[in-house]
């Protein structure tokens, strides 16, 4: 390709493509970044989030490279917004928990012990917890003196001239 054709090709290719090929200092690229920074800080009425230029992931709002943490780290960008992480290794978390446990009074159960389970109430075999009741449609809600109330409601619909039956069940404690 001669120089004139190369220049025409470069002008016809969007600046984002050139920036990925290493032309991040191109004036159009800088202008695009400045415009994006104004959109982020200003007030287009969206959610305010910025997408990563490479993969579309959520980018940090203060990232000057407009990239997600993974892209900034993998491309070696010096980015102050992605330096600090909230993730703490498990060993450090355990050390911190042990330090807090020695400072605070021992109100928790020792490790490995659990709260004892409550015993079930054994009901006599003669009592029945299942009650079948036919609820008339016009009477409203039926009141029963049992632990559980099971309701079964049948619904009949007319759809395209055919009756369709549906059943709804509910259990109330």
Swiss-Prot record:
Q: Which is an annotated GO molecular function term of this record?
A: metal ion binding
Q: Which gene encodes it?
A: SRS8
The entry's keywords:
Activator, Auxin biosynthesis, Auxin signaling pathway, Developmental protein, DNA-binding, Metal-binding, Nucleus, Zinc
Segments of skewed composition (Low complexity): 100-110
Q: Where is the DNA-binding region?
A: 52-79
Taxonomy, superkingdom: Eukaryota
Provide the Gene Ontology terms for cellular component. nucleus
Role summary? Transcription activator that binds DNA on 5'-ACTCTAC-3' and promotes auxin homeostasis-regulating gene expression (e.g. YUC genes), as well as genes affecting stamen development, cell expansion and timing of flowering. Synergistically with other SHI-related proteins, regulates gynoecium, stamen and leaf development in a dose-dependent manner, controlling apical-basal patterning. Promotes style and stigma formation, and influence vascular development during gynoecium development. May also have a role in the formation and/or maintenance of the shoot apical meristem (SAM).
Q: Cite the binding residues for Zn(2+) 2.
A: 52, 68, 72, 79
The record's annotation in Pfam families points to: DUF702
Identify its protein family: Belongs to the SHI protein family.
Question: One of this protein's GO BP terms?
Answer: auxin biosynthetic process
Q: What is the disulfide pattern of this chain?
A: none
Region of interest (Disordered), ranges = 100-121
Q: What is this protein called?
A: Protein SHI RELATED SEQUENCE 8
User: Where does the UniProt annotation locate this protein?
Assistant: Nucleus
Residue positions binding Zn(2+) 1? 52, 63, 68
């Amino acid at each position: 390709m001669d120089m004139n054709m190369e220049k025409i090709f470069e002008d016809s290719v969007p600046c984002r493509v050139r920036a990925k090929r290493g032309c991040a200092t191109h004036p159009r690229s800088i202008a695009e970044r400045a415009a994006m920074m104004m959109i982020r800080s200003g007030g287009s009425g969206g959610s305010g989030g910025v997408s990563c230029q490479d993969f579309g992931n959520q980018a940090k709002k203060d990232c000057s490279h407009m990239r997600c943490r993974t892209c900034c780290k993998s491309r070696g960008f010096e980015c102050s917004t992605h330096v600090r992480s909230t993730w703490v290794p498990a060993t450090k978390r355990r050390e911190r928990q042990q330090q807090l446990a020695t400072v605070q009074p021992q109100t928790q159960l020792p490790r490995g012990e659990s709260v004892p389970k409550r015993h079930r109430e054994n009901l006599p075999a003669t009592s029945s917890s299942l009650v079948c009741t036919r609820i008339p449609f016009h009477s409203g809600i039926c009141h029963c003196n049992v632990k559980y109330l099971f309701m079964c409601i049948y619904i009949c619909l007319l759809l395209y001239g055919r009756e369709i039956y549906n059943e709804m069940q509910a259990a109330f404690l």
